[in-house]
Regions:
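H/E-rich (His + Asp/Glu) clusters that bind or coordinate divalent metals
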Residues: 229-245, 251-256
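Acidic/histidine-rich catalytic cores of soluble enzymes
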Residues: 7, 34-35, 133-233
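Active-site beta-loop-alpha junctions enriched in small/polar residues
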Residues: 8-12, 38-42, 77-82, 111-114, ...
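Active-site acidic/histidine proton-transfer and metal-coordination neighborhood
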Residues: 34, 64-71, 81-174, 265, ...
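Hydrophobic faces of well-ordered beta-strands that scaffold small-molecule active sites
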Residues: 3-9, 35-37, 72-77, 107-109, ...
Length: 291
């Protein structure tokens, strides 16, 4: 397994709209190995902000990123949220189209459900989509926020909404652990341990101490609470250190900045340097043990 440090693209609203190609070049200059774009299943960009890529913008980005040596191993698919979802057939068609254009293997979805109805709806949908696309070498992956960690009652028992989702989704739908939201709603170390057999990628997100005080909701979280990895309260380094016990982990460590008061790319660069340093320290320790 080769570790790759990347960034999600959805938070780079202003940067991509102002200078799309320049922002891709800056991502490479920072030293990132990969990106995870947010894809809209539509041919033309039109008036859609450029942090959400159409097929045509994906083609343009793929060509430039190939030249820069930056890969696209995963993509977040804009297929709906909460109770709204695109039809299964449209999602499947879109994934296969993207796979043909860019060769992406991992397709990430977020439903943001907190109850059994939403968990069941998204679980059934992604179970079916996974069955459609697995023969083509594509993996369907779920990305958590905070809602999915809520406990729901079923008879005399309780379980987390994410567990309910996976009962419907089946064994082939994997997890992209957003450790920041896991920490915000539950415990990032416990989440990584509990779902280690599902995790294929991780989103490295950090929050300031005040964000964890119970004062904020995800929707009301101000930009000042989103800090570079290692500057906040989330145990990002410790969770990264657990990846070797995750049998399906593919090496992708995706920086999830989302908002910033200091500058998105500047914060992403800090996070990249910090994670790279941790990995180098870990490799040095391993080498010393081997000697």
């Amino acid at each position: 397994m080769t570790d790759r440090i990347g960034t999600q693209c959805y938070g780079l609203h202003k940067e991509f709209d102002e200078d799309f190609r320049g922002t891709l070049s800056r991502i490479a200059a920072i030293g990132l190995d990969c990106v995870e774009p947010y894809l809209m299943l539509q041919e033309e960009q039109g008036k859609t902000p450029k942090d959400r890529w159409s097929y045509s913008l994906l083609r343009e980005a793929k060509q430039q990123l190939d030249e820069l040596g930056v890969s696209i191993p995963s993509a977040h698919i804009g297929a709906g949220f909460m109770s709204f979802t695109m039809p299964r057939e449209k999602i499947t068609e879109g994934i296969l189209r993207v796979h043909e254009i860019a060769g992406i293997s991992n397709y990430v979805f977020s439903g943001m459900f907190s109850g059994p109805r939403g968990a069941g709806k998204w679980g059934r949908l992604l179970h079916d989509v996974s069955g459609d696309v697995r023969p083509y070498g594509c993996t369907v992956v779920y990305h958590n926020h905070d809602d999915e960690w809520k406990r729901i009652r079923r008879g005399s028992d309780t379980l987390r909404a994410l567990d309910c989702f996976y009962e419907y989704a089946g064994p082939d739908v994997m997890l992209e652990l957003d450790m920041g939201w896991a920490a915000f709603a539950w415990d990032e170390l416990q989440a990584a341990q509990a779902y280690r057999d599902r995790i294929v990628m991780m989103h490295c997100r950090d929050f300031a101490k005040e964000a964890m005080s119970g004062r904020y909701h995800r929707v009301t979280m101000p930009a000042s609470m989103y800090v570079p990895v290692g500057d906040g309260e989330v145990k990002v380094r410790e969770v990264i250190g657990m990846r070797r016990d995750m049998p399906h982990f593919n090496g992708n460590l995706i920086i999830e900045q989302e908002k910033s008061t200091r500058g998105m790319l500047a914060d992403i660069e800090v996070s990249c340097r910090r994670i790279r340093g941790w990995l180098q320290e870990e490799a040095g320790t391993d080498a010393a043990i081997c000697r």
